[in-house]
């Protein structure tokens, strides 16, 4: 039993739909804005960290080059000092045994130790893998966080796609959600541009089925009578037909028995139905003719009977007249005394 829906309830339902859609769309937009801001902040921090890393790396390279130049100069000076010290500090001493010993100052040993320490400092100033990792650690962390934020940003539902899904269900109730107005609107009525359903075409369409059986019968008879004689002709199944002097048609491939049987049955059923319709029409015509003949016969018989009755009445009248005349003549003869015959 169809219960009529109140207008107020319809408006309440529409208001509920509007509020729900607007809330979901606003939440989606807020989430997208928040993650977009986060991604922008991470992108700026990543750019700053990369700039700092490259600047730090260049500064360390410059310091390394400067230290190498200073160390090379120091080494040259130390070598010259060693040579000068060797020349100035060599002392010839003689022992009791008469051996000559060369005594160098302790400055030579000290200079050698200084050279070793400077070489160790140069080796320590070169950057290692740990230094590189610490240098690029903040930039790598920021890049990973930026990638995750972008993934989350694009994983959030799009408001346009959400509205299209909502409209796909609202179309069933002849309403839709307008994104620009943010309201539920009624669908406009469809206007048919073609004039197929006009009065003239509809009347012609009603008259067409009366002519279809004759046209279809002519088509079937024409198809059965048609014969292919050309070598490049093909039948309705696509099989090539080759002319033969003994027979008009020779098929390269025989028809399937089932399909041929069904095709012939369809023609037989249609022709039989059409013949039955014609027979029924003929029977109706015969019935009409018999009715007309019976009516004519009955009317003719009635007319003949009436004519016979008229003849009988005329005969009776003649007989009455003759009797009257005879009686009058007899009375006249009797009164005059002589015989008179009619």
Curated annotation (Swiss-Prot):
It is a multi-pass membrane protein. Residues 198-220, 311-342 are annotated as: Disordered. Its main location: membrane. The chain crosses the membrane at residues 35-55, 134-154, 161-180. It is found in: Membrane. GO terms for cellular component: membrane. Keywords: Membrane, Transmembrane, Transmembrane helix. It comes from the Eukaryota. This is Uncharacterized transmembrane protein DDB_G0284971. It comes from Dictyostelium discoideum. The lineage of its organism: Eukaryota, Amoebozoa, Evosea, Eumycetozoa, Dictyostelia.
